[in-house]
A protein has these predicted regions:
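N-terminal active-site beta-alpha-beta segment that forms phosphate/nucleotide-binding
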Residues: 1-111
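Conserved phosphate- and dinucleotide-binding cores of soluble alpha/beta proteins
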Residues: 82-178
Length: 178
């Protein structure tokens, strides 16, 4: 089994081989699958993420669904994440790590979140996730009032791997779309 460091290196190399057009086509297919997922259809409040260039491109998807669903996005605050309600592109700024973040008030009604969509460097078929190594999502998702919320990891097909080494603090996904 490859180490977490080795898997990250492999994924970074695979990312370099993917054209922008391929990434956009794959993103569209993954997000179409998500949009038709029964859990997404039923959800009123969805935690999504503002994508980085090497992730499933979520920007248009967020704008598309903000009219019919309450969309909340993570914002990095020191060593932790908090959520903010997405309203419009105009109410976004570039935050930590170059991530586009909402500038509005914090959303603290975590028990109202119906579905959590999670990015990752890699996922395996069992639902194990490999992040970027800072632990933001693992810390956030370990909060008691969202531990049982359904979590779907989304990634590009080349980010699906056979197996990811896990540690006790790693939070599993209920499902992975990639």
């Amino acid at each position: 089994m490859l180490s977490k460091v080795d898997i990250r290196q492999v994924i970074k190399q695979r990312n370099k081989c993917l054209s922008k057009a391929e990434r956009e086509a794959q993103s569209a297919a993954i997000l179409a699958h998500l949009a038709n997922h029964p859990r997404f259809k039923a959800a009123q409040t969805v935690m999504l993420f503002s994508s980085l260039p090497d992730e499933v491109n979520t920007h248009a998807f967020i704008r598309q669904w903000t009219q019919t669903k309450r969309i909340v996005l993570p914002v990095v605050k020191g060593d932790d994440m908090e959520l903010r309600l997405f309203t419009t592109e105009e109410d976004m700024h570039i935050g930590a790590f170059g991530i586009s973040e909402p500038i509005g008030l914090a959303f603290d009604k975590l028990d109202e979140i119906d579905l959590i969509i999670v990015p990752g460097m890699a996922f395996d078929k069992e639902g194990h996730r490999l992040g970027r190594g800072k632990g933001y999502y693992d810390r956030f998702l370990s909060q008691p009032n969202i531990m049982s919320t359904y979590k779907i990891g989304i990634c590009l097909p080349h980010q699906l791997v056979e197996s990811i080494p896990t540690e006790a603090h790693d939070i599993m996904m209920n499902e992975v779309i990639g």
